[in-house]
Amino acid sequence: KIGDEVRSLADEVPFDIPDSWEWVRLGELFQHNTGKALNAANCTGQLKQYITTSNLYWDRFELDNLKEMYFSESEIEKCTVIKGDLLVCEGGDIGRASIWSYDYPMCIQNHIHRLRAYVPLCTRFFYYLFDLYKHIGWIGGKGIGIQGLSSNAIHSLLFPLPPLAEQHRIVETIDKLQPYTDAYADVESTLDTLNTTFPERLKKSILQEAVQGKLVPQDSSDEPAEALLERI
């Protein structure tokens, strides 16, 4: 809020997007909640393995030496992730994200947000948005970026929403370009003369083009994002 007035979306949008896109709050697209807080005194319910922020890395998980704690039936429903859920760190490396891609469910601790889409979306597109927001300091950065990711903060995050077909095309293009940014990262480790920040700048540039609707051609036959929102 600014004083007693709630800022409108128009006051907050950081860049222009194509006409077929929409600016939306993350909470409009995803049901989200955090996991269970560690409570050593709680010894009732089912003993379950769980992951913490120390298991969640960008686009991957480290699942060795998982810990266990007790979960009640209601906690299992609230704190279990399934294949396709987007997980985001609330603490630790704030905003770090990965998609749970395993065929089995897993419980989460309270410093991880579970995001589950209300309607069919390309979840990986939103993973890349978190990647971009983290790299440019809009999440967990210094200055005016969001310093923490409470439930209210993540609910209010402003994201560009392309048509679903375009979401998939953007992800396909980024995935094709990713090996080139990785190759630059390998080169920088062996060549002292190479600007060490170039791979990150290149990645940020690619992601920035993607979320502004400039990475892939616009297709007039795509169902607009507005129609996607109407189904929520």
Briefly describe each language-model feature range.
Residues 1-2, 176, 197-212:
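Core structural elements
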Residues 7-36, 164, 168-171, 180, ...:
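Non-catalytic DNA-recognition/assembly elements of restriction-modification systems
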Residues 52-53, 69-133, 141-143, 148-150, ...:
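A short beta-sheet element
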Residues 208-209, 216-219, 232:
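Extended, well-ordered alpha-helical scaffold/bundle regions in very large, multi-domain proteins
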